[in-house]
A protein has these predicted regions:
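Bacterial N-terminal signal peptides that target proteins for export
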Residues: 1-7
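Bacterial N-terminal signal peptides
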Residues: 7-17
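Thiolate-centered catalytic microenvironments shared by cysteine-dependent enzyme domains
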Residues: 25, 90-181, 256, 260-276, ...
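Active-site neighborhoods of enzymes that stabilize oxyanions during catalysis
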Residues: 29-38, 44, 80, 145-210, ...
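Mature N-terminal segment immediately following signal peptide/propeptide cleavage
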Residues: 30-59, 70-73
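Helix-loop module immediately N-terminal to the HCX5R catalytic loop
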Residues: 81-109, 220-251
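C-terminal soluble interaction/assembly domains
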Residues: 238, 243-296
Length: 296
C-alpha cells in the first residue's frame, strides 16, 4: 500500500511538471490498443482456435513449474543470440521464423505474450515480432503471469502438443538502431527529431550514458512493482512529453543489452509513436569506447 501511495505522489508531481502543450499532445487513448490485453480478456478467449499464448522465459524450469493453460514455452535463446542476458541481440530472420513456427505460430495466429519472471522478456519478443512484421497479430498480457496468479486464475503444468506453424516474415531493419547512426544523432537528437532515452535505472544512467540521452527508467511505465499493470495511455504520453517527445519524433531506446529498452519500445509503439531500439545498447557502445557522459 505504501508503494502505491509513493507511486501516486510521484505521478502527480510528474504530471504537474508537464506544460499545457505537452498535456494536449499526450492525448487519452492508445493508438494501438490491440497491442495489450487484460487477464480477463485472455481468460475469456483461452479456447479460441487461433490463439497462441507464449510463455517467454529464461529457462524451462519456470515454465514446467506453472504456466497459463495452453501456453507454449519460448526460451529467450530462441529469439536472442544468447541463452541468458547479457548476450542478447536479434537472431537471423530465418532462425526466428523457424523457432516461432516450431511452437505453432502461423500467419493467422493471435499471439499473446507474457513473461515468466521479468516483463522485458515479453516486450523483447514483441520487438522481435515487430522486426519480423508480425506485431499486428501480437499483444502483451497486461500484468503478466504475476497478475494472472494474483487473481487466482488457473495454472497448468501440461505441455500442449502443437502442430508446426507456417509463418511469413519480412524483416524491418528500421526498428533496429545501429551504433553509427546513434552516434550521429546523439550530437543533437532534437535536430534529428529523435528522443534518445536510456531505459536503465537512474543510477546506471548517471554512471555513464550516451550523449544526448535522457533518463527514462522503463519500470516507471507501470503502476508499481507489486502491481505490474501498464499506466494509462494519457499518463504514458505525458511521461514521454516530459522527456522531450514531440509529435513526429522517433523514440530510440537503449539500456544495458536490449531487454529494458524493449519495454520502452513497446510502450512507444502502443502509443503510436515511431520507434526503434538500439540493440547493441550500452554494452556495445561502451565496449567500442564511444563518447560517454557521467551524471545528469
Amino acid at each position: 500500500m505504501r508503494l502505491h501511495w509513493i507511486a501516486g505522489l510521484l505521478m502527480v508531481a510528474m504530471l504537474a511538471s508537464v506544460s499545457p502543450a505537452q498535456a494536449k499532445a499526450a492525448g487519452s487513448k492508445a493508438a494501438h490498443p490491440e497491442f495489450l490485453v487484460s487477464t480477463q480478456w485472455l481468460a475469456q478467449h483461452l479456447s479460441d482456435a487461433n490463439l497462441v499464448i507464449i510463455h517467454a522465459g529464461s529457462s524451462d524450469d519456470d515454465y514446467n513449474s506453472a504456466h497459463i493453460p495452453g501456453a507454449r514455452h519460448l526460451a529467450t535463446n530462441k529469439f536472442t543470440e544468447g541463452p541468458t542476458p547479457p548476450n542478447t541481440e536479434l537472431l537471423p530472420s530465418d532462425k526466428l521464423q523457424a523457432n516461432l513456427e516450431a511452437i505453432g505460430v502461423s500467419d493467422d495466429s493471435r499471439i499473446i505474450i507474457y513473461a515468466s519472471d521479468w516483463d522485458p522478456f515479453a516486450a523483447r519478443l514483441f520487438f522481435t515480432l515487430d522486426y519480423l512484421g508480425r506485431a499486428g497479430n501480437a499483444a502483451l498480457l497486461d500484468g503478466g503471469l504475476d497478475m494472472w496468479i494474483h487473481e487466482k486464475r488457473p495454472l497448468s503444468t501440461d505441455v500442449p502438443t502443437v502442430a508446426p506453424g507456417k509463418l511469413t516474415v519480412q524483416a524491418h531493419p528500421e526498428v533496429v538502431a545501429r551504433m553509427d547512426w546513434v552516434k550521429q544523432v546523439s550530437a543533437d537528437p532534437a535536430a534529428a527529431h529523435v528522443l534518445l532515452t536510456d531505459a536503465r535505472p537512474l543510477r546506471r544512467y548517471r554512471g555513464g550514458h550516451i550523449p544526448g540521452a535522457v533518463p527514462g527508467f522503463w519500470e516507471k511505465t507501470q503502476l508499481a512493482e507489486e502491481t505490474p499493470l501498464l499506466r494509462s495511455p494519457q499518463e504514458l504520453a505525458a511521461m514521454f512529453a516530459r522527456l522531450g517527445y514531440k509529435p513526429g519524433y522517433k523514440v530510440v531506446s537503449y539500456c544495458e543489452v536490449g531487454w529494458q529498452a524493449s519495454f520502452t519500445y513497446f510502450v512507444a509503439r502502443y502509443l503510436g509513436y515511431d520507434a526503434a531500439m538500439y540493440d547493441g545498447s550500452w554494452t556495445e557502445w561502451s565496449t567500442a569506447k564511444q563518447p560517454a557522459v557521467r551524471g545528469d
